[in-house]
Swiss-Prot record:
Pfam families: DUF150_C, RimP_N. InterPro entries: Ribosome_maturation_RimP (IPR003728), RimP_C (IPR028998), RimP_C_sf (IPR036847), RimP_N (IPR028989), RimP_N_sf (IPR035956). Its main location: cytoplasm. Belongs to the RimP family. Required for maturation of 30S ribosomal subunits. The keyword Cytoplasm applies. CDD domains: YlxS_C (cd01734). GO terms for cellular component: cytosol. This is Ribosome maturation factor RimP. HAMAP family: RimP (MF_01077). It comes from the Bacteria. It is found in: Cytoplasm. Keywords: Cytoplasm, Ribosome biogenesis.
Length: 158
């Protein structure tokens, strides 16, 4: 449990540091992931804008983010910085993002089991207060947003 708190506060610190940089360049900061992988970690910044994201957009954000990260130095270990668009299988981070993608198929992984399971794949019904509502087969689950480790849209190619 304690590790999750550290990761969460690290994410909050990175979000507070990097979101203004991204938004100052004219992009939406869709979300930030910090994945600790032993000695080497990955910091991912997802950016978006009307009309989509190009490689040049990612490079511009990467340059500015690198500069602020070098000065502020919030990550003491080695890490790789990745900047990308959310893509078709976009990750979902906020209640607003979950609400705006209601009606789509999602894959959700929880930090710890809920009703005996950690993985849910089904129809995103929306949000209720601080819960994400997902329908798996004919059963609805209300998953607290704070318990979600990772959530992605499952692209439809119909």
């Amino acid at each position: 449990m304690h590790e999750g708190v550290q990761v969460s506060s690290k994410l909050e610190q990175l979000q507070a540091l990097l979101a203004p940089v991204v938004e100052g360049l004219g992009y939406q900061c869709w979300g930030i992931e910090y994945v600790s992988q032993g000695k080497h970690s990955v910091l991912r910044i997802y950016i978006d804008k009307e009309g989509g994201i190009l490689v040049d957009d990612c490079e511009a954000v990467s340059r500015q983010a690198s500069a602020i990260l070098d000065v502020e130095d919030p990550i003491s270990s080695e890490y790789t910085l990745e900047v990308s668009s959310p893509g078709m299988d976009r990750p979902l981070f906020t209640l607003e993002q979950f609400a705006s993608h209601a009606g789509e198929q999602v894959k959700i992984k929880l930090r710890s089991p809920f009703e005996g399971r950690r993985n849910f794949q089904g129809l995103l019904r929306g949000v209720e207060e601080q819960d994400v509502v997902v329908q798996v087969d004919n059963q609805e689950f209300l998953l607290p947003i704070d318990s979600i480790d990772k959530a992605n849209i499952i692209p439809s190619f119909d």
